[in-house]
Amino acid sequence: MNCEQRRLCPFGLVLEAHFPGQDVRDLNVEELRGLLRQEQLLVLRGFKTFTSAEDLSHYCEQWGEIGLWPFGKVLERVERDNPEDHIFDNNYVPLHWDGMYRPQVPEYQIFHCLSAPASGQGGRTTFANTELALKNASPELRELWQSVTGTYER
């Protein structure tokens, strides 16, 4: 893979561009899929990316069929003052899964940040690895979790 690789803890991998202007589309999607299956999370930093939502959706189609939402293929999330939906404000959103209202679980979710914080400053999105949580939980905790059910309502 023509980029720098750095492990995240406790899971995931950061892929950083080798040079300014390196285009994310030049990375082999099959190799990225393999890394994603192995690492569960890929963060790509410093790459030239997309000029429009349509450009992003064309790239995502290389990964597989795109699930359609009421808003289309790409949610352009921009913080707003007094938004109608909490997802567009800049307040904390409790731990959730972005596909929680969908009947099918997508194989991949791709997020694209137009204005990311500097390296080392972190971001505002928390990613969790359920497999690791289950592996590291005590038998008592796993038993407790098995008794919990939930329903998403909007």
Regions found by a protein language model. Give the residues of each.
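Non-heme Fe(II) oxygenase catalytic core, chiefly the N-lobe of the double-stranded beta-helix
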Residues: 1-154
